[in-house]
């Protein structure tokens, strides 16, 4: 009979409408004969083909259901009347099971007898019987049944009534792991995995139970005639999670790994796992990790990278102490590095595993110089170069390789080798990658290799163009690294400077200096690091301007002149340079005054904007130059004294003192040199703004003149004094004589100073000062005598 599906509705099954004569839907009997010839054509193993075992008469199933329903009803009635007693199972542990519910369902008889569903489904379901009659609430609150109710029933529990509700003991787990039966191994894995992932290994089995479990897990990794890939994969994951946690007890688990590895490495100790010794847990894992296209390959590599790169493990097995230099340790170092580099050479190795191998090489090379030398001899730098060329779409691998390259290129030999292979150009070709973290690592490595002399032999035109485009970025780290790379890349190669000028690097650098306040409004977790980055950007941009305007003999003068003209034509350059000379640190002051001096000497018209331009503290440029010169001269003297008394200081502290002394010396020389130019050749207003503080005795240049001055400072200082005292208006006011009189200088001082100096320019200028001072003193004396005579005549 045809039944309209749209008009047929499923009815809820209740005790009132239950009819045991109705066939259950839990099992559909197969017709006696195939309904069509199509069924006859099906293959013999098809579940839809008529089989002998399901060719039973259809009425036998109905009779079976009738008998089961009668039994269910009787058991249920007995339980509702309170006369049903749960049977006591054999053994010490009592297991209580409820009778099947009168409700017909698709659940099997085994399901109703399971420990969980006997209480949860049968007792708590609204479709079941009234539980108050049987005092069910008191019954289930008795331990240990309450704990069973607190756990959510899973499908696996319903399907497997023998599934355990409590953790296995350590001996049971070890026995199951050592078993060759898959079901036993799987049971141990199911018992271990959730507890280990939750960090409860020691709390559950204690140290005495956890250590044998770890040994048994490693024994699972030893190749067997019959093994399951999923079991091996899970063993790797459990071992990985056991050393991954960072709680207080993790060191206790680490020591279990250490003891097992030490036992394997000891050639004279008792046998372990029936493997030839010396051996190690690293080799156990590597044996599995090298098996490609398996389910456990990636899990093995993840465990290996943690065993190699975890700081505590590196300290114990890969350090440089004498305890790590035994033959067994040296053998381990060699095997691990050869495995990692061999994996990089194999074309069939997955990109993820290559990235993990790169991390192993990087961390172990950082920890142990011997391992680093071993890696270099095996050609690891060339392998890194190949990865950067070929694996351009795998971000994780590129990122790990860039970190390792930065470490290895810190050595001049490796960095030079990488640059000579064209590595700098390869790195610049990846600057368009969309990953920010990869871009950071690329620029870090570029900044390091661009400081090597080997870069001057490379054609970096296209690379420079790519880097210049990045310095306008809003990312502080990218701007710092990009400007640092440009600073280094133009230091050794004159052609690189010319390429930078052609790409308009002067305008870009000034724009970054002008808009650098945008970085101060960006939120940052580490404020101190953030400030250091911003200061580094300032110094890098000013250094770039200093490099491209340099006119040393090895530089291209036309390129430097072009850079000076570009700076002079920039409307913001004067304000920017004056600002950083005024409020910057000593590095910024030194670089800013150097650039100003070069540009004004090359393009004299660049001095005009400074005539009316005031600094942040409202002083004009000449006053600022003189103030900074006096301040740096004082710092130079103090630092020189410290240098003489630094016998007990470290080499780094002495280098810092020497660097500070040189910076202050350069500030004095270039500030005074620029003042000389402004007062002798530029707009007269520069001298007039300076004349007032010179004549009132506030800043007398002779007061700072000492025998301790270096030749460089003394030459610029004397040239400045002669330039301001040789002007017509200065000669008319006898400025030289006034300075000498205020400072109480004598000819004997200048004669002694002249005798100590071998520089002919200094001797010539000292002679001019002596002659001019003597001449003006004579004129002043004559005028004074004439004034006295006139006064005497008036009195007469």
From Swiss-Prot:
SUPFAM superfamilies: ARM repeat (SSF48371). Disruption phenotype: Worms exhibit premature cell cleavage during embryogenesis, symmetrical cell division during gonadogenesis and undifferentiated intestines. Embryos show a defect in centrosome positioning that delays ABar spindle alignment and appear to lack endoderm. InterPro entries: ARM-like (IPR011989), ARM-type_fold (IPR016024), Armadillo (IPR000225), Beta-catenin (IPR013284). Residues 17-59 are annotated as: Disordered. It is found in: Cytoplasm, Cell cortex; Nucleus. It comes from the Eukaryota. Its main location: cytoplasm. GO terms for biological process: asymmetric protein localization involved in cell fate determination; canonical Wnt signaling pathway; cell fate commitment involved in formation of primary germ layer; cell-cell adhesion; embryo development ending in birth or egg hatching; embryonic body morphogenesis; endoderm development; endodermal cell fate specification. GO terms for molecular function: alpha-catenin binding; cadherin binding; DNA-binding transcription factor binding; nuclear receptor binding; protein kinase binding; protein phosphatase binding; protein serine/threonine kinase activator activity; transcription coactivator activity. GO terms for cellular component: adherens junction; catenin complex; cell cortex; cytoplasm; nucleus; serine/threonine protein kinase complex. ARM repeats lie at residues 462-504. Antagonistic role in the Wnt signaling pathway that operates in embryogenesis. When located at the cortex it has been shown to inhibit Wnt signaling during asymmetric cell division but when relocated to the nucleus it shows positive regulation. Has a role in blastomere signaling during endoderm specification. Component of the beta-catenin-lit-1 complex which promotes phosphorylation, down-regulation and subcellular relocation of pop-1. Within the complex, activates lit-1-dependent kinase activity. Can substitute for bar-1 indicating functional redundancy. PANTHER family: ARMADILLO SEGMENT POLARITY PROTEIN (PTHR45976). This is Armadillo repeat-containing protein wrm-1. The gene is wrm-1.
